[in-house]
Amino acid sequence: MAAPAQVVTALAPQGVLRAVVNLGNPVLAQGTPEAPSGVTVDLAREVGRRLGVPVVLECVDAARLSFAAVAEGRADVGFLAVEPERAAQVAFTEPYVLIEGVFAVPEGSWVRTADDVDRPGVRVGVKQGSAYDLFLTRTLQHAEVVRGADGTVAFEEHALEVAAGIRQPLTRYVATRPGLRVVEPRFTEIRQAVATGRDRDPAAVAWLRDVVAGLTADGFVAASLERSGQDATVPG
């Protein structure tokens, strides 16, 4: 069924769907700016197909850049973790995938569980503006958040006690560096959703939510993740 004209106008006011894709999250997007792939690319193209408009992809390398593009109206949709700070400026669908934030530490560290991290004198490396940066900034009371181009970059450059990151890439990082280990359990569950500007027509936001919920429920998201070789949890 074609989307109502009101929805098309609200979500694609320039006659194309401008979608911002974060290549910095390898679970959700892969490839190059010239040839991106992954579940977020598939979702963008499917939303565009249902709207009946072409899709223009803008690729960035950090969630904060995706957020800025959507919040400032330079992109019509983006793919972001649901966070209270972001929800003040963008409208979210329900999550289409769940990923985990985990810590990594040296093998000899006294940190045994995620709860051990929040102590005075502990410094945690994070990717600036990432979902887990926002979460840890909001929740840590004693440990210090140190931001960098990536949590592992900050961890190495500043000889930090802890690195934070998304489970899949952080696990791969640890696997190539003897002397490090991943801390279990996760410290947060990251709820990835589709975002659009909070000023968009409520009917269009509701339509987008329905579409994403349907694509999550009918196996579209799971199939896309499988094609891209990603192991992530689909809600429901």
Predicted regions: what is each one?
Residues E94-Y96, V105-R123, A206:
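Flexible hinge/capping segments at coil-to-helix
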Residues M1-A10, A131-G148, A213-G236:
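Ligand-binding clefts/hinges and TM-proximal coupling segments of bilobed small-molecule sensing domains
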Residues L23, V97-E107, T171-A213, G229-G236:
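Periplasmic-binding protein-like
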Residues A29-P33, A44-P54, T93-E94, D118, ...:
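Ligand-binding cleft/hinge of the Venus flytrap
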Residues R64, A68, L80-Q89, F135-R138, ...:
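A ligand-binding cleft/hinge motif common to bilobed small-molecule-binding domains
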Residues A2-A81, R86-A88, D218:
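Extracytoplasmic small-molecule ligand-binding "clamshell" domains
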